[in-house]
């Protein structure tokens, strides 16, 4: 593995050397690449927030302390440094630096919160003249996460004590101000993750020893105004996030660290931390259905199953090579059948977490469906699902959902009873004292290849009787979904005929029981035909009448010759969430170059159009040579070669026509009709990019982002193993890149061998690859035509990209992660190792991140282009992590299962609902490998899959053009799925989507501004003149169409389906309001002949 890391770092250094040569020519804002390298957490922290030299001290402390302890110690050391004359301003600066550095350590030196989430730290006075510490939080503190935000408040208290300050002593009005802000934030801005009671806010506001304050983040004003120590009358969103989603919500963790550090004044948190006591006799855990995920039903995104409803997804434990980190497996036949699930589509789920990404796994159970002709079939492959989809009348069972043990561990959710499956059955036999040691069934081979083992009904009963194990899952039906009475009715019906090759029965209402049990059968000539194996299993299991009982399976086991297990004791409810995505990153409108042209380029910001006007006046920054006083837009003076100094930006007249002509000549590009610039620069220095770069981007049809990098966004999906065939790369090329052996230790010779993915290798989407080919051509043109260097990439096809380096970056972070392209996928996603995603502080529950060619970022990125507003440094590669250390990344990846099978004890104990930590001793996961060579290799999977991109590549939601078609497909699907109540879906769409949307749009229409079509100026009210100052026409910013867009479809749904009368009346009242808004309410005089 060290050879792999060293090779990555050698190639990175090679790219840096090219970038250094290019930047040294002085044609950019800086003469050196502006993305520093960082090998570990300590270097990332120093590169992100400083101070200089802190990396060495962090590494010293890391040896014998946890990350949190290091953060507190570093904070105290920085803050308590000697200050001349105890200067308050210098002490404030040290306290500010201490808090930022400590927060950066807590967040792995990745997220932007230490830079953007803390506005400033001040030392202020209480009303008794004692001094205290105040932390000004800003909105981006959210990116730190609740725990880090909470600990930043605790660290501030630690700093307060280290520098000898008193505690914050709020007065009543200040406390009540917090209470009002929380209520206003939730009613006017957005919901908090945790909604505290007013008394909880009062307690926190009065007891926290430092002032948790902040900048105004919203225009909403409070009634507790003009407070002496609060500088704003607006809502302080950052402060509320730190207090509510931080300190209050994460109270147990804050209290834990406060006790460890022996910090006084935090005991009040125990009121938030005490777990409810169990009453006497409350030994058994009862897990109720959780309906939270269906509280908001969105139009066009179907509900696939109501909470714990029969026929929903069945829980199956295990991790496939493409699941984990919140991605969960579904059979590709289910995906093909539903069409709304593609590879990477998000699902909102009942448990164990809130959401996941769907990926295909074909070694689990697929759906059971009833066709229009009455047949009931199990669908076992995507091709069959595609063929019969139009014939499906009802989806009786959605199939399995493969959920890793780590998902329960991460969410601290009790284990749910496991579904009876083949891998459990095999382990049960192998552990049976009656099973011979010579393994007559060759189960040691099939224990990880159970899908290859075919067992007849006769053999299944013989094995069960001989080795005293439950009946094979193939012949165990969904008995728990029917009553004892229904099974007795079924038994009587079965006994009306004799089993020969098949069992042929008269068509009777009892057929519905067969359907619910999931027994495959055909309908032929008004007769029901059951295959020999299924008929044999039913008749033998139901050989005697069942005694009345509330537990059907228990009653069945009293009469069955072999033990019957519950096939699906846990059903998981779901609904479709966010669609998958793979798309180039574009600003709106999308520029080719960060060069300001004001309004001269029209609405398209077209530079050639602006150049036709000759000279233009724009606000721009320029550099001046201190030697010869020549003004330019370069870091080295084009006249004398001296370093230039960037001056203050201001309004300047520039000859754009001449600049454009010279730039085109410099890069030997003939006239282009469209090169898009920007209206104005939003950076502090307002220093523009060279026009040559925009010309070359336009030539190659690529677009720049706010920091001058070119990016492509994709949904994140995990991958620990792959085959050469599914990533479209030859065996020979993979061997060149270091993949010489498969995951079982055999020499790599075949396209279908399974290889273990290296931790910084990525599989990008084909769309991403095609875009990066164009980016590579742009970079080569830039090197050759602008910097006068040799071309580097020389790519013609996407296959030529294999082996090249990329930088991965998540939107809320400021540290990019080094990666290497290893292949391509047809899915709309970027597959990477769980460590890679965790290094960006992301998981795979539909998060999407960007990739950029590393050389493009090194050549073009500059901090000078970043917005000067709050949050401007988020989503920018301020530092590049070159090596992933599993111990220094987000700990969610530490929960990844690494076993080739789920231990038998997990299956057996799952029926007792234990906490995941209670069975952790039999689990092998990443956490147990940290600090060992095994943390990088040998991370096995329990379930294989044929292809990681099997099934639909694009979900139906994205394919259907109109909301009406989306909703009709949503309702049609609801009618077919047994686990869904169609009426509830219709009411849910109306209540949580359409009606609130229309009401909000009516409100927006009545409050809207007007906009000038010529200069884009906006007015709160129409000017008395009726036109803009520039003479342009004024138009509304909210159209009538946006107000009424859901009205007709709402009325149609209400008329077609029997919904609640109250909802019907709400629609009628809303329609009356809309008509009143757009039509005159005056009664019109009519002639008498209207009534004749």
UniProtKB/Swiss-Prot annotation:
One of its GO terms (molecular function) is DNA-directed DNA polymerase activity. One of its GO terms (biological process) is DNA-templated DNA replication. The keyword Translocase does not apply. Pfam families: PolC_DP2_cat, PolC_DP2_central, PolC_DP2_N, zf-DPOE. Keywords: DNA replication, DNA-binding, DNA-directed DNA polymerase, Exonuclease, Hydrolase, Multifunctional enzyme, Nuclease, Nucleotidyltransferase, Transferase. Its EC number is 2.7.7.7, 3.1.11.1. It catalyses: DNA(n) + a 2'-deoxyribonucleoside 5'-triphosphate = DNA(n+1) + diphosphate; Exonucleolytic cleavage in the 3'- to 5'-direction to yield nucleoside 5'-phosphates. It comes from the Archaea. Belongs to the archaeal DNA polymerase II family. Possesses two activities: a DNA synthesis (polymerase) and an exonucleolytic activity that degrades single-stranded DNA in the 3'- to 5'-direction. Has a template-primer preference which is characteristic of a replicative DNA polymerase. Heterodimer of a large subunit and a small subunit. This is DNA polymerase II large subunit. It comes from Methanothermobacter thermautotrophicus (strain ATCC 29096 / DSM 1053 / JCM 10044 / NBRC 100330 / Delta H) (Methanobacterium thermoautotrophicum). The lineage of its organism: Archaea, Methanobacteriati, Methanobacteriota, Methanomada group, Methanobacteria. The gene is polC.
